[in-house]
């Protein structure tokens, strides 16, 4: 337990930052899920509107991930991993692997 004024304040600040980071990560995960669902929708029913939806969702997810790194919520290697997952899903949805 905190014994002096500065350590009590640090506990409060850490809790505040934890909650902010938690909500930011949650928003980021939501955008990633939207991107994955847009990819699956496009795979099932290809079309120009579905393709535009995929592009918009990946752009917003990438933006949120990059901002999370900038704010210190996420490590840059973790962000690169997440962006790679999204890119692979979009690539597979838009350009499916040819059957050989």
Swiss-Prot record:
One of its GO terms (molecular function) is structural constituent of ribosome. Gene3D superfamilies: Ribosomal protein S20 (1.20.58.110). Keywords: Ribonucleoprotein, Ribosomal protein, RNA-binding, rRNA-binding. It comes from the Bacteria. One of its GO terms (cellular component) is cytosol. Residues 79-100 are annotated as: Disordered. GO terms for biological process: translation. InterPro entries: Ribosomal_bS20, Ribosomal_bS20_sf. Belongs to the bacterial ribosomal protein bS20 family. Binds directly to 16S ribosomal RNA. HAMAP family: Ribosomal_bS20. This is Small ribosomal subunit protein bS20. It comes from Prochlorococcus marinus (strain MIT 9303). The gene is rpsT.
